[in-house]
């Protein structure tokens, strides 16, 4: 079995991966046939739970490690989920390809990086009028404040902040629904690792 997640206890997996992943599901955003990019999907969260919840979503699982995508191909085949696509590469590079740029109704992220970095990585993939959906932990309000400049530059607006509580857990978390209100400038995202070292 591939070591793709640090959480292995069945109850913890249920709460911390599946229920947490589904906390972002809202029919207002995840409409039938929506093209979804699960950026930095890892072991398939939130992408796999979303595919189970709504099998008419067209989800592209995106990761920099091929072994994770190989595993997810097996999972989606086992689930008979027919709309899966797989993208191997870096967020900062694939966004500059016409086939992916501003091509998705929704981009999801969970436990990938701080929000100013994610805004630069994710929004270039989102169609104008679409949404970047970020699952964030306790520091979400602070991260939103940190992201004001990045949002302005990349064309995003925080439309909904939905605080969440998971069963049996005391920690704060929230789902952020960030609307793409204008095109992202073509120079973004910047080259690999620049956003992390020097956030907007």
Tell me the role of every PLM-derived stretch.
Residues 56-62:
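Short beta-strand element of Class I
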Residues 129-142:
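Conserved beta-strand signature within the Rossmann-like core of class I S-adenosyl-L-methionine
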Residues 145-200:
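SAM/dcSAM-binding transferase cores
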